[in-house]
Amino acid sequence: MKGKKIILALSIVSIIGIFTGCGPNQGSKDSEKSAGTDNTTVRVGFFPNITHSQALVGREQNTFQKALGDNHKIEWKQFNAGSSEIEAFLAGALDIGYIGPGPAINGYTKSKGDIQIIAGATDAGAILVSRKDLPIKDVKALDGKKVAVPQFGNTQDLSLRYLLTQNGLKDKTKGGTVEIVQADNPDIKTLLDKKQIDAALVPEPWGSRLVKEVGANVVLDYDKVWREGKYPTAVIIVRKEFLQKHADIVENFLKAHVDLTDYINKNSNEASDVVNKQITDLTKKSLSKDILDSAFKRLTVTNNPEKDATIEMVNLSVTTGFLKQAPDTKDLVNLDLLNKVLKEKGQKEIQ
């Protein structure tokens, strides 16, 4: 009889376990997850460029790692082209990334909405220049000229094609008279110096470098290229799956990003030195003080991804043929966590 009572008691315990949905260790695992003690490696993409200033300063000062705590590890992955970074996202090799809005839009489209923009990083910071011996004064004078951009479909390329359209011009592939070529920024400098291209639309610090190192003329400054400079040059993207599983990690990452944006804007000289140190460490080449100062004057370090401009870029991508059709942009920009962070810090939320 005593044995039957023991068996009955064990059966009741088992039944309770089934109905509560817990095995012997399930409760402790759930409490660990809710307490944020699971170890997660967060793979973050970035460029060694001043347009990714928050990433560079954050790397140098360990800001993101401190924000995420000891239970998680930041793993930085360096890229030099947005297309390569998007490929890594599509392969599931990245979780969060600093990137240009053009590639971000492409990633959102190719992933069928799995890649989302969750914050801005920098605005503007691109200029249109011509080689020193050409008296190009405006966009109309690009008629019959060869113009370089860093990459087809990126922010500078879309901006250039917009400018051409606004001035009654088209590129040669569309039956127009302007030849658009793509080349890496260092190669654009060489091509301009050797008179193998006539003009270029490039991001900082390359705009300042072309002016100071090969005597390029500024045709349009940063605030004349598009929307008076109120357009994104770099944004933060995340895999939706990662965001859903690790919203707390993404929120803490954004807290660090917002703090870094404030720090850079309030301590521009000190921050530019930190950025330059990171660029030197990563590329083995430093920027001169005058180029760095000139470049930063053309940039706006911000948390705002300029949603309206980003949506307009989608339309430009369709118009120029980089996207076959416009995707549903409803989930392209997700500012819920960013606005939560901004509200907690007493800062204005972004619409």
Name each region found by the language model.
Residues 32-181, 198-201, 219:
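Short, glycine-/small- and polar/acidic-enriched structural segments
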Residues 62-72, 223-228, 296-306:
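Short, solvent-exposed loop/beta-turn-alpha elements that line the ligand-binding surface or hinge
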Residues 73-74, 171-177, 280-293, 324-331:
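Short, surface-exposed acidic
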